[in-house]
Amino acid sequence: MNRLLINTPITANWDSDTNIDKKTIMDAVNALRSSHADIAYPYNGIVYQTSDILQIYYLNTKDIKVLYKNLNKLDFLYNQPIYGGDVFVNKNKYIDAGMENERNYGWGNEYYDRYNRFTNLGYNVYRVDAPLFHLCHSRKENSSFRPKTFHHIFSNELFRISNSSK
C-alpha cells in the first residue's frame, strides 16, 4: 500500500481529465468525515463533455463558473448517470471491499465494478447534486476504445460482481 494511504482516513480515485466545483469536493468529503457515507461521489452522475473552445476558455480563466454558465452548449458524455470519474472512499471500507479489481483492463470498467461491489456490501453511497465536467482530449493508445473482446470480458466480470454477496 502507498505510504501516503497509511495515515489518511479517506482515499480518492480521480480521473485526470475531469473537473468539478471545489464546493462539491468538500460536500463529498464532509459526508465521509461525518460517517453519513462510506463512498461519496462529488457529482450527481451527470457528466458534460466540454468543447475545444470552451475548454480553452475555461483553462485560461480557471473559473468553474465558465462551465456552469455554458451548460446549454455542452453535450452529455453519456446518456445515463455514471459512477466513475471522481470518487472518495472511506479508506478502511475501501480496503475491506478489496480496493480495485485488477481484472479490469483499460478505463471505465472499474467504475461499475467498484459501485456494484460497494453496494453489494451494503456501503452507504452519497452523491452531491452537481455535474462533473469531462475535458475533451484526443483518444490515443492509453485512452482509446477497446476491442469487443474486452467488452465481453468486462461484461462477464461485471455479471460476476453484480451477483456476488457479502
Q: Which residue stretches match the model-derived regions?
A:
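Conserved catalytic core of nucleotide-sugar-dependent glycosyltransferases
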Residues: 21-102
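Short, high-confidence coil segments that cap the C-terminus of an alpha-helix
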Residues: 8, 36-38, 123
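Glycine-rich, basic loop-to-helix element that forms the pyrophosphate-binding segment
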Residues: 1-4
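Active-site acidic short loop of glycosyltransferases
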Residues: 6-9, 99
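Short, solvent-exposed loop/turn segments at secondary-structure junctions
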Residues: 18-19, 45-48, 94, 131-133, ...
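C-terminal catalytic/acceptor-binding lobe
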Residues: 75, 81-82, 91, 102-166
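Short beta-strand-to-loop acidic/aromatic patch adjacent to the donor-nucleotide binding site
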Residues: 8-19
